């Protein structure tokens, strides 16, 4: 089943050329320092429930096993992790761009108090509202389950902020192909996004990486007249 999915995957026209950790911030408006002579980099953010597999997906995406680490206190960690990532056009290495991959703190952890949830909302909301260079958000959800209330609230925040986002269904290797197609349609309807913006993925089987790469490259306009 998984091999069939891999064969049907879109070919990646971009590749990751570099990936490294920059900084973890405790204020939503705090950003990595801009090197003199450089312009501020565009940002691509990843967000999702605690234990959705966000760190594993980020590591799969950049092909670095331990770049993003799992929080020891799911639902309570309020830091935004920034990574410097380079992406290049496969057929011409001279065409490329660097961007900031932003790992936002997880939400929806059952043991977290209402006060902690409000703090998360204010913290992440502050980042989303004030990040002028944010180009796109990947919202991760576990493909095995129905849309959760916290996921629906997150999608409402993104829609309300008019921030473009795509849904990434994680852990696809755990279910059948027929179930995948069914869940893709369910999540597209639940989050009010076109089906083509719902990506089926698996960090374990490296499913969905090509589609993620192509979307990021297109959002950043890597292959444009300016590059």
Where would I find each of the regions flagged by the language model?
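Conserved G1/Walker A P-loop phosphate-binding module
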Residues: 2-109, 222, 226
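Conserved C-terminal guanine-recognition region of P-loop GTPase G domains, centered on the G4
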Residues: 121-196
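Flexible beta-alpha connector loops of hexameric P-loop NTPases
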Residues: 107-117, 174-176
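Short, glycine/charged-enriched secondary-structure capping and boundary segments
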Residues: 35-36, 61, 114-117, 152-156, ...
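Canonical P-loop GTPase G-domain recognition
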Residues: 16-31, 174-227
């Amino acid at each position: 089943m998984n091999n069939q999915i891999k064969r049907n995957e879109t070919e990646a026209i971009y590749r990751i050329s570099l990936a490294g950790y920059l900084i973890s911030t405790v204020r939503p408006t705090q950003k990595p320092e801009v090197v003199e002579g450089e312009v501020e980099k565009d940002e691509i953010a990843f967000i999702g429930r605690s234990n959705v597999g966000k760190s594993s997906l980020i590591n799969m995406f950049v092909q670095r096993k331990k770049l993003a680490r799992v929080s020891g206190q799911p639902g309570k960690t309020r830091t935004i992790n920034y990574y410097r990532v380079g992406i290049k056009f496969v057929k011409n290495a001279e065409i490329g761009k660097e961007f900031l991959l932003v790992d936002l703190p997880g939400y929806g952890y059952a043991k977290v108090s209402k006060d902690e949830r409000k703090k998360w909302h204010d913290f992440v909301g502050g980042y989303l509202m004030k990040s002028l260079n944010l180009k796109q958000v990947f919202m991760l959800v576990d493909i095995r389950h129905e849309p959760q209330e916290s996921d629906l609230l997150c999608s409402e925040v993104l829609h309300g902020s008019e921030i473009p986002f795509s849904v990434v269904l994680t852990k696809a290797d755990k279910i059948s192909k027929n179930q995948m197609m069914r869940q893709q349609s369910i999540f597209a309807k639940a989050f009010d996004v076109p089906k083509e913006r719902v990506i089926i993925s698996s960090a374990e089987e490296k499913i969905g990486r090509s589609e993620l790469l192509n979307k990021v490259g297109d959002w950043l306009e890597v292959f444009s007249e300016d590059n």
